[in-house]
Amino acid sequence: MSKPAEKPQGERPTGGKFLGYDHLHFWVGNAKQAAGWYTSRFGFEFFAYKGLETGSRDVATHVVKNKEGVMFAFSSPYHNDNESQKEMNAHQALHGDGVKDVAFAVEDCVAIYNKAISRGAKSVQAP
């Protein structure tokens, strides 16, 4: 097991203060059931939905939100043999239910992005 760094690594960015978490996106076997668990047990409220009724033929996503504004999005594929859901199905088979990505709320997204790129990060999508 590795030890956490005792000192900050590198200089702190001058812009782009971390404000909190915006959302976590979970890939799960049953999005509706997972969202229901968080609303019935932890005080989250239903916030948004994407699925068959909204025109999505591949994935269902249920979004819940807590009182602090943090959102959890739960997504599950409708089919396990669809090419468009290949990554999601492979991830589910290997790991089971879990967090796929985390989004932070920040003061200046562009400053943080530029600093990360200057330190060698690879861009997935520019802000």
Question: How does the language model describe each region?
Answer:
Residues 1-32, 97-106:
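N-terminal beta-strand motif that seeds the catalytic metal site of vicinal oxygen chelate
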Residues 2-9, 31-34, 111-114, 122, ...:
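Amphipathic repeat-derived elements
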Residues 2-9, 62-85:
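Conserved oxyanion/phosphate-binding beta-strand-loop segments in alpha/beta enzyme cores
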Residues 8-11, 46-48, 86-88:
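Short secondary-structure boundary micro-motifs
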Residues 16-71, 118, 126-127:
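Core segments of cupin and vicinal oxygen chelate
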Residues 38, 89-127:
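Hydrophobic or amphipathic alpha-helical targeting/insertion segments
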Residues 51-53, 81-91:
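Membrane-interface interhelical loops and short amphipathic "cap" helices
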